[in-house]
């Protein structure tokens, strides 16, 4: 919880305070600014560039090689924990930073649903698009750069937070995100080659 709280404080709330000093329209729309930056940096960027599929820590190594948990169950367990903690923690944290409870709940729900979509894209890249997978660092760097530019650059360039930018808390988008999340979880549940992915993760871990 503390790590997520500090993340929102440093990368979202502090930039908002900086922008608010020079832009009255941003200052007067604090909730919109926090929502927009969170969506770009956490929901989009975090899901695409910071997926857990190939990030194998010591705990995962012990679970698979020592405790003999299957790579399939290990990955799905990690994903389930991440989705639930994101939903619960971010709902609380966004509310603490001045976002209404309803909007905090909706954005956290959207974020939870987009997480498995990011993992599904990583699986598709690993399985079907080797050129993109082999250049994943460049892909991740591009996603991060674009997300940062949109999150910080758009409000500074426009000197306001447009209500049109908050489409992601509209009920229609939330329902669409739910369908995307369900489809992604089904795809990940049915995917047969987690052992192959785990071998690649072990190779990356040895290189590091």
Residue spans of the language-model regions?
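Hydrophobic alpha-helical transmembrane segments of membrane proteins
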Residues: 1-61, 70-208
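Catalytic-core elements of nucleic-acid end-processing and repair enzymes
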Residues: 66
């Amino acid at each position: 919880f503390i790590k997520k709280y500090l993340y929102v404080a440093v990368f979202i709330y502090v930039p908002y305070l900086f922008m608010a000093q020079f832009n009255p329209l941003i200052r007067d729309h604090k909730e919109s600014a926090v929502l927009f930056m969170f969506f770009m940096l956490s929901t989009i960027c975090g899901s695409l560039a910071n997926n857990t599929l190939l990030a194998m820590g010591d705990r995962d190594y012990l679970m698979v090689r020592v405790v003999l948990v299957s790579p399939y169950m290990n990955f799905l367990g990690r994903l389930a924990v991440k989705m639930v903690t994101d939903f619960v923690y971010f709902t609380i944290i966004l509310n603490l930073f001045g976002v209404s409870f309803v909007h905090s709940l909706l954005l956290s729900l959207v974020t939870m649903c987009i997480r498995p979509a990011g993992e599904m894209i990583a699986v598709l890249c690993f399985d079907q698009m080797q050129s993109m997978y082999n250049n994943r660092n460049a892909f991740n760097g591009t996603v991060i750069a674009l997300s940062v530019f949109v999150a910080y650059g758009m409000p500074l360039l426009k000197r306001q937070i447009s209500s049109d930018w908050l489409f992601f808390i509209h009920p229609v988008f939330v329902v669409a995100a739910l369908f995307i999340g369900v489809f992604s979880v089904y795809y990940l549940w049915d995917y047969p080659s987690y052992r192959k992915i785990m071998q690649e993760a072990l190779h990356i871990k040895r290189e590091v």
